[in-house]
Amino acid sequence: MNLILMMILISSLISTILAIVAFWLPQMNPDMEKLSPYECGFDPLGSARLPFSMRFFLVAILFLLFDLEIALLLPLPWSTHLDPTLMLMWAFTIIILLTIGLIYEWLQGGLEWAE
């Protein structure tokens, strides 16, 4: 017990010392060249952050929703031995809800990439 406690104490102490050194060491000598952004040897003219299209975010969110649908539907076949009708009801409910959401998004024009 004492050996385990000693190993935990030593490893915690070494980790803390290394974290403190890694935090304070770069702050001792800040170099302006290292702090400036690098764009292929040219001085940066504008902001490095370009705005994204709202269409891109909408398609990304739709992708995440359908990815979540797959994650919810994959374990359902293993639940058939408990109650097959309940499993089918859950699967149809998930699919119908996502289909209704997709149709709504389609009718609102959210899937059109070009305006």
Curated annotation (Swiss-Prot):
InterPro entries, per database record: NADH_UbQ/plastoQ_OxRdtase_su3, NDAH_ubi_oxred_su3_sf
CC terms in the record's Gene Ontology section: mitochondrial membrane; NADH dehydrogenase complex
Record bears the keyword rRNA-binding: no
Keyword set, alphabetical order: Electron transport, Membrane, Mitochondrion, NAD, Respiratory chain, Translocase, Transmembrane, Transmembrane helix, Transport, Ubiquinone
Entry GO MF terms: NADH dehydrogenase (ubiquinone) activity
Membrane topology category: Multi-pass membrane protein
Domain of life: Eukaryota
Transmembrane portions of the chain: 3-23, 56-76, 84-104
Protein's cellular compartments: Mitochondrion membrane
Function: Core subunit of the mitochondrial membrane respiratory chain NADH dehydrogenase (Complex I) that is believed to belong to the minimal assembly required for catalysis. Complex I functions in the transfer of electrons from NADH to the respiratory chain. The immediate electron acceptor for the enzyme is believed to be ubiquinone.
Protein family (similarity comment): Belongs to the complex I subunit 3 family.
Name of the featured protein: NADH-ubiquinone oxidoreductase chain 3
Organism: Polypterus ornatipinnis (Ornate bichir)
